[in-house]
Structure formats: structure tokens, C-alpha cells
Amino acid sequence: MEGFRQEGQALIFEQNHETVRLEPWGGDSLRVRASAAATLRDDLPGALLAPAATSAQITIEATGASIRNGALLAQVSPTGRIRYLNALSGLELLAEEEHIQPHGWPGPRSYQQALGGLYHLEVRFQPNEHEHFYGLGQQTHGLLDHKGCVIELLHRNTQCTIPFVISSRGYGFLWHNPAVGRVQLGYDRTLWVAEAAAQVDYWITVGETTAQIVENYVDATGHAPMLPDWAAGFWQCKLRYSSQEELLSVAREYKQRGLPLSVIVIDYYHWSLQGDWHFDYEKWPDPAGMIRELEEMGVKVMVSIWPTVNPLSQNSPSCSGAGCWSARSTAAMPCTCVTWTTARKARYR
């Protein structure tokens, strides 16, 4: 059945084989899911916690529909275009692109078939001239404001992407798709892309301050535990310490000068062969004694363990037998992870 309907606290829109679901998800927040499949899925991995019970105000009329949760209002046109407003001030926060027919424009949401029953997904929003975007994890371009940038939604060495952005217009936006993709924060449009995903899934919140937006975000995704004091201190790392004696000499110098040192990091090539996951005992003859001396100086030790394996490593046969090598395949293959348990057996402590 096409058109609008209310389902509990959710607003549902169906048209042209697309289903869109808007529902309250935490204070002043909405979760939006959309799919070209017959039904929306609830079994997909993600970052959002189950929300506390929230009462939404839903209105359905001939001219469209709306759903309000606290200070966040979403208005949906008869064609399915969504606008988000601050319900207290009336400010338009974010609006999807218009449907332009019949000129071949894809509209605000598009679905292109991919392998495995998934879709290449795109969601398009209109730009705001003086809007600024912050967040998105750890990027390497050196910019505070991401406006005008194209950001990969994937991890690389030195790049840790979190698909959550805070806008200067007073909203936060989480792209809730565990898929490789990108976001284009352009001057002509804002475009979110998932290369292969089951459905569109995002979460939006509004706040009077950045702190309130972040508070809504952590309420929705989970609060991190409080860090111990040493974790917030000074960390010393070098590429690389070649021996136990070299590392201890650095820590002793800090101690002699009265400089506070919280953590010292033992990075790569402290092993004999890559994948052995234990120290090279010729250069690191007494790891346990080293750690005791460091802890007596108030210094914690972090050891970098790499998941790559030399074919000559003592762990190579067991990894091969367990099917642990990654390979390009269109089929889902079982994989057993042995790195952590093997490292523990090597007694990194």
C-alpha cells in the first residue's frame, strides 16, 4: 500500500517499491531507514543502541506528513522528500534534494543493485552556503572544517574514519551503514555513499550546543568508560626501539630528569619473524624484568602486535590450517582469528 501510515511511534512512507521509516531514537533524535527491498531489516550490525521509549508526534495529511521528537521535526513531502527542522526555532537544518522528473535526476535516494543482494546506495542533501562540518574521525588533510572535502568512509593506516559529523547549523548526523563509501560535503550538494549495503540507515539529532549534540550521540551509541589517569599522560613512541636496553635507557633518562612518562610503546620488529608474536630474545632477553623495572618507574608498556605472518613463522602452519588467510572472493568464507590467543600464549606481560 503506497503513501503514509503510522506504525507505533514510527512514520512509514511507501512509494515505487521504496519503503522509508522514520522513528524516534533517543532525545531530540530520529533514525531513518529506507530500502528498495520488500522489507526493512532489523538484524544488521551497527552502532546504535536500543533506544529508550520515546513518544513522537506524527501528523499525516494530504499535503505530506511529519514526525516530531522533542526539538527535531521531520517533514516528508508526498514524493518522499525529507526536510529536517529545529522545531523550537523553525530553522531548516537539512533537506534532501528535490525530485526532478522526468529529466532523469535520481532524486534524494538511489539504489543500484550490487552483489549478494546488496545495493550501491546514495543519499543527497541540498547544500547550505555558510555551513561548516566537523568530526568524521581522524583524517590526514589537516583541516578542521570539512566543507568542500570528499572523505573516504574507510580505515587506512593513519586514517580512522567515524561517519559522524557535527554541523554549524546545530545538528549531528551519523551515517549508520557498516560499508565502505564516501561523503562529499560539497558546495553543490552533500552526498553520502555506501558502496554495498542492504539499506539506507542514518541517525540525526539536534542540539542548542555542540556539547548537547555530542551528549545525544553518546546516549545513542554508548558511553565510553572513564580512562585511567595514566592513559591521559605522555606517551613516548619511536620508529623504532631496536633492543630492550635502548628502550630502558630512554625511560631511565626520563626518570633521571624528573619528566613524567606514562606509557612507552614497543613498535614493530621487536619479534624474530613477523607473525611469531613474541620478542626476539637476543635483543629483548628479559621482557618480564623490563616491564617490572618500567612499572617501578610508573611507566606502562604498550606492545604493537601486527596481524601479518611471514611464511617461515612458527605460526604460519596453524594459521594456514585454520583458514586465516584473507582472500578476494564473492562468497562468504569462514575465518578463525588466532592472533590474540597466540599472542597471550607468548606472554606479552
Q: Can you name each region flagged by the protein language model?
A:
Residues 184, 242-243, 274-275, 312-315:
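Short, solvent-exposed polar/charged micro-motifs at secondary-structure junctions
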Residues 307-349:
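Active-site-adjacent "subsite" loops/lids of carbohydrate-active enzymes
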Residues 53-54, 282-284, 330, 342:
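Short capping/connector residues at structural and topological boundaries
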Residues 259-261:
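A structural motif
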Residues 271-278, 346-349:
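Short, basic, glycine/proline-bearing loop/turn elements
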Residues 250-257, 275-296, 314-315, 333:
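Catalytic cores of extracellular degradative/oxidative enzymes
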